[in-house]
Every structure is written in C-alpha cells, then in structure tokens.
Amino acid sequence: MIKSIPIPTAGVSLGLAALGNLLQPYSPLMKYTCGILAAILLAMLLIKILRYPKLVHADMTGNPILGSVAATFFMTTMQLCVYIKDFAPFLCEAIWLAAVAAHAILIIWFSKNFMLNLELKNVFPTFFIAYVGIVVASVTAPAFGYFTLGYYIFWFGF
C-alpha cells in the first residue's frame, strides 16, 4: 500500500492542514482533526520516500508535474510544525527550518532539471507550486520569530 501512495498526496495533506487553520476560530476540535489527518497522510508519504527512494526519485525526475507538486510536502511540513510547536518548540523549529531549506533546495533542483531547457509544450500550471509555495514559510515564520526571513521569502515568492 505504501509503495502506491502518489506524491500529490502531499497536496491533499496541505489542503487539510490549511483547512484546519481556517476552522480554528470555529472549532479547535476540527483544527486538530484536520491536522491529524494531514499528518497521517504526510507520514505515509514520508515512509514511501524512506523505503522506496529510487522509485520516488524516478517519479520526480521523469515527470515535471510530480517534481513541482513535491514542494507541497515541505509546505505541509511547515504548516504542521505550527500546529504542534507548543508541545515541542525546539524540535518544531528545527523541522520548520529544515523544511524551508529543503523547499529552497527543491526550487534549485527543479530549475536545473526542468527549466534550463524549457519548451512551452512542457510547461504546466503546477510549476508555480515549486516557486510560489515557499511563501508558506512567510506565513508560518512569525510563529517561530523569523519575521525578517518571512519578509524576504514573501517577496521572493511574490
């Protein structure tokens, strides 16, 4: 089952994490329900990445859509770190910083692999996810006190 989980599952997880944040003022229970579901999906994808790295690498390098959508993994991680930062602040901050750095590395990797020899027929709307998605870091940065970093990331993504 784990082997067949698609990379875009991270996008569903991101949607759930964002929905939970949206519902927080109305129902803390719904916030954490969405967060738990998002974390379960993300954990399943992480297990796939760890158990089948060659398969994931082949998916990402062979398909620019999957390569760009992979950024949602790091975007979700940033959001979920804010969910649980009150329980493990130092760990969450470290994971958040790692997710921001990994997203930046993904931008470089994606640019190198899919943007250097770009042809219009191979351009897809998902390309924006790789570049603009890092703005999630600017939204979540204040939770960890990284206001300046969040400011610059916002303008990069804008």
Language model region names:
Residues N21-L29, V82-E93, V139-G150:
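Helix-coil boundary and interhelical linker segments in multi-pass alpha-helical membrane proteins
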Residues M30-A43, P89-A104, T148-F158:
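Structural signature of hydrophobic alpha-helical transmembrane segments
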